[in-house]
Amino acid sequence: MATSNDIKNGTILKLDGNLWQTIEFQHVKPGKGGAFVRTKLRNVTSGKVVDKTFNAGAKIETATVDRSEYQYLYQDGDDYVFMDNSTYDQITVPGVVVGDAANFMLENQNVTVAIHEGAPLYIEMPPSVVLEITYTEPGLQGDRSTGGTKPATVETGYQIQVPLFLEQGTKVKVDTRTGDYLGRVNE
């Protein structure tokens, strides 16, 4: 059994019969009164986000989660198929569990899959990925100096905002947490 002082980002807690992933945490020591830990938790199964406060040192129950490297193979309807890089076993992960990670996953890409008691909980993507722009409107000659943005579709089908000077076929770096354009990649 752990205490609330052990909470870190990514910690999986068991509360009220559900599993919750810590998104944010803050240890607060007010000038008056006892210290506490303020957290933002995401329900692993439903995706619901709640704020919860724990007294400092309060006993909490954490869940054991195995994180392993998997290779994304293909999409099968609403499900996604991954292969364990060490055992070559294939697992099927429901689209609800994959969530927004689907916007940035390419076939044969390595991701981390978190598994609890044999069931996949969530997909951990790298902080950024390189994707190719498959469609965007051409930028107009006069627009290049304004610093504006335009919509662009990347190879996964996800739409991002990119600078006006970028063209179809350009590889760009995209933040997997926010979906924001980070920069152009020269290869």
From Swiss-Prot:
The alphabetical list of record keywords is: Cytoplasm, Elongation factor, Protein biosynthesis
Give the domain of life.
Answer: Bacteria
Biological pathway: Protein biosynthesis; polypeptide chain elongation
SMART domains the UniProt entry points to = EFP, Elong-fact-P_C
Gene Ontology terms, MF aspect: translation elongation factor activity
Q: Report the function annotation for this chain.
A: Involved in peptide bond synthesis. Stimulates efficient translation and peptide-bond synthesis on native or reconstituted 70S ribosomes in vitro. Probably functions indirectly by altering the affinity of the ribosome for aminoacyl-tRNA, thus increasing their reactivity as acceptors for peptidyl transferase.
According to UniProt, the name of this protein is: Elongation factor P
